[in-house]
C-alpha cells in the first residue's frame, strides 16, 4: 500500500508520480480520496491502465472508462437538503460560497436551479482560491448581502477559518449554514462556539445509528481503540473504496476497463454506509444533521 498526499497545497507533481508508479508496475490500482480537480487530471493520465476508485462526494457526471466514483452527487445530497431547510426555516435569500474549482462551481450551478424551482432569491455567489489568508472580507460581503442562508462549499482549512470568523461575528443569529463537505474533524477544528445553526448533509456520519455503521464501528474500535481518529465521511469512503476495488476485481475481472461510474455495476461491498435501492441501482442513504457542540445530531433521512 503506497500513500501519496494529493492535496493541492502539498505541491506534489501527482500526475508524474502516479504515471511513473504505473509504468514501473509498482501499483495495480488507485483508491483516491482527493479533490475533483485532481481526479480530472489523473483520469487523463491513467487511461484505463489500472482501475481507479474515486471515493468522496463529487459533482457527478463521471463517465471515464475504468474510473468508478462511488460518492454521492448534488442531486442525491444537496437538493434534498436545501429543500428540507427551506421548508423548515423559510430563508428568503441564499448565498453560495466556495473554493474556486469544479466541485463547488458544479454544485452551485445545481443549487441555483433548486433556488429557482423554490422561487427563492440568490443574494450572493463567490469563489475564493485555496488558502485565502483572511476570511474577514468574505464574511463582510456575506453579512452585507442580506442572505438568510449560506451554502458553504469551502474545503479543509478554508472551511474551518470561514466558520471561525462567521461564529465570532455571531452571524448564526441571522444566517443558517449548510455544508456538504464538513465532517467531524472539521467540526472540532471550527470550535464549539462557532457552530450554531450549522447543518451538514452526507451519506455517512460517525455517530449515526444504523446497522451498517454499528458493524463498521465495532471493527474500527477493535483495531484502533477509543483513541483512534474520529470516524467521518471522508475516512469511511477510503475504507469503502478499498472494499469496492476488491469486489470489483474478484467478481468482474478485466471488465472494469470498458466500464465506468454510469454503468452501475452491481458491486456489493462492505461499507459503513446504508444503501437503498433506486431503480436498478443501490445508492447510499443521505442524512441531514445539525451541529451540536463539536458533534452532529438530529439526523434526518432525506
Question: Where do the model's predicted regions map?
Answer:
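Short beta-strand elements at the ligand-binding edges of bilobed clamshell
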Residues: 61-83, 125-126, 195-204
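Short, well-ordered alpha-helical microsegments
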Residues: 38-40, 78, 104, 135, ...
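An alpha-beta-alpha
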Residues: 71-126
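Segments of small-molecule ligand-sensing domains
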Residues: 222-235, 246-300
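Short beta-strand elements in bilobed, periplasmic/extracellular small-molecule ligand-binding domains
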Residues: 1-8, 64-67, 115-135
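Periplasmic-binding protein-like
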Residues: 21-34, 53-55, 95-96, 146-157, ...
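Extracellular/periplasmic periplasmic-binding protein-like sensory domains
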Residues: 165-236
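Beta-alpha junction/loop-to-helix N-cap segments that form part of ligand/metal-binding clefts
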Residues: 1-60
